[in-house]
């Protein structure tokens, strides 16, 4: 059976077309040009007309170049030798270390059978009060971080990578600016977390289509480690770049566009990645946090809009803080009843008072007379934002709850906050003489 073809029928964008037989969808090929060789993946079959997506781009490729089909889909190596290593979007070493080619596994496999999943039950502590107290991250949860360009979403991921109580961090970068990539690397190395981290990074200087592999390669490795009993946290940034790469390929393939030019299968493509989040019975787990930037701060943009139907809530980053009103962890009730008996009460009461403080801020801005209660709310708002909402705050959950009580006692009387007497008697700070 012929597996090497020496004629390329057409080259359009990053897609080449050859006439070939016995080729499977998703099969990998090597395109050999005069000076280089590039990986390509079969993305369309029309009888013997085969379209391949070239991951390194088609610059330098001619119609006389050789295409060799490998007979298998994209693969990545899997072993503990990956710990502390940095790879590009195609799994090639980016850190100057040796190439790893043993124990290869296929990427892009199906999601775990729902019957094999267990109900989420464990909290992942991050040391960030706006997560731990108010929208708890739960093991095996899938959550996006909605943001706009310019917000410190990558800095937030760095904080989570450094502080999250997990066994392994897998960072998948898509279209990362070189400065952001270096910041991830240097921050994790300085913080001592690089040894438990695996990087798969497609930078803005790399071919755009290479970013399509990053989520699949990251999640394939995560699944294998989870099956070995490790608690894995996958951090992806930025899923909008991933969707834009899909859009670029769809336009090249002359697919009928859907909303704002994105392919019609955008939802299923995103879902197939997010649904990899799982907690295995008797083994480990995969938790996914994925940055999704919103062009123009538009939550109805196709990427965040579709994402919201797939995930179990979202963190909404605005003004350099995790916005409490736009953020939601739909699984927090699975775990915040197991932490401390005042957790849910503090969470509900503080957010309720913070919402009331927004009305007082508006009254002050419009020149209305301020009541004593308004002044208390204004003081509370300032303390809440500086001591709990600030992303630089790094304290354990129990200290964050104690701090919540301190803030309440600094601004209000016990009877003003609507909390049960037994909890007030147990946790209300005693004033020092």
UniProtKB/Swiss-Prot annotation:
It holds the Pfam family ATP-synt_ab. This is V-type ATP synthase beta chain. Keywords: ATP synthesis, Hydrogen ion transport, Ion transport, Transport. The gene is atpB. One of its GO terms (molecular function) is ATP binding. GO terms for biological process: proton motive force-driven plasma membrane ATP synthesis. The lineage of its organism: Bacteria, Pseudomonadati, Spirochaetota, Spirochaetia, Spirochaetales. The keyword Ion transport applies. Gene3D superfamilies: 3.40.50.12240. Produces ATP from ADP in the presence of a proton gradient across the membrane. The V-type beta chain is a regulatory subunit. InterPro entries: ATP-synt_VA_C, ATPase_F1/V1/A1_a/bsu_N, ATPase_F1/V1/A1_a/bsu_nucl-bd, P-loop_NTPase, V-ATPase_su_B/beta. The keyword Ribosomal protein does not apply. It comes from Borrelia hermsii (strain HS1 / DAH).
């Amino acid at each position: 059976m012929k597996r090497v073809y020496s004629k390329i029928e057409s080259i359009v964008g990053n897609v080449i077309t050859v006439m070939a037989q016995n080729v499977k969808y998703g099969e990998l090929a090597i395109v050999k040009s005069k000076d280089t060789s590039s990986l390509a993946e079969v993305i369309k079959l029309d009888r013997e007309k085969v379209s391949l997506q070239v991951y390194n781009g088609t610059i330098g490729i001619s119609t006389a170049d050789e295409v060799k089909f490998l007979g298998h889909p994209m693969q990545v190596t899997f072993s503990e030798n990956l710990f502390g290593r940095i790879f590009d979007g195609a799994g090639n070493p980016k850190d100057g270390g040796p190439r790893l080619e043993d124990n290869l596994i296929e990427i892009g496999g199906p999601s775990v059978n729902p019957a094999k999943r267990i109900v989420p039950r464990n909290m992942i502590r991050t040391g960030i009060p706006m997560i731990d107290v108010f929208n708890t991250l739960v093991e095996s949860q899938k959550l996006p971080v909605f943001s706009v360009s310019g917000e410190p979403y990558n800095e937030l991921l760095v904080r989570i990578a450094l502080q999250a109580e997990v066994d392994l961090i897998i960072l998948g970068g898509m279209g990362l600016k070189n400065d952001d990539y270096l910041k991830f690397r240097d921050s994790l190395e300085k913080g001592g977390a690089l040894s438990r981290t695996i990087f798969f990074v497609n930078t803005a200087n790399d071919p755009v289509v290479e970013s399509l592999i990053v989520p699949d390669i990251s999640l394939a490795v995560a699944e294998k480690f989870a099956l070995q009993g490790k608690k894995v946290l996958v951090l992806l940034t930025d899923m909008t770049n991933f969707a834009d790469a899909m859009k670029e390929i769809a336009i090249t393939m002359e697919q009928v566009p859907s909303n704002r030019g994105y392919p019609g299968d955008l939802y299923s493509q995103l879902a197939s990645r997010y649904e990899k989040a799982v907690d295995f019975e008797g083994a480990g787990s995969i938790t996914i946090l994925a940055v999704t930037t919103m062009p123009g701060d538009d939550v109805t943009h196709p990427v965040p809009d579709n994402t919201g139907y797939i995930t179990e809530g979202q963190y909404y980053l605005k003004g350099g803080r995790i916005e409490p009103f736009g953020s939601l962890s739909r699984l927090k009730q699975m775990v915040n009843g197991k932490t401390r008996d005042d957790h849910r009460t503090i969470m509900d009461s503080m957010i309720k008072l913070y919402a009331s403080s927004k009305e007082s801020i508006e009254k002050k801005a419009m020149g209305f007379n301020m009541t004593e209660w308004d002044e208390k709310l204004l003081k509370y708002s300032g303390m809440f934002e500086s001591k709990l909402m600030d992303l630089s705050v790094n304290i354990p959950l129990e200290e964050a709850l104690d701090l919540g009580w301190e803030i309440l006692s600094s601004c209000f009387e016990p009877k003003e906050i609507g909390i049960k007497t037994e909890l007030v008697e147990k946790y209300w700070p005693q004033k020092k003489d």
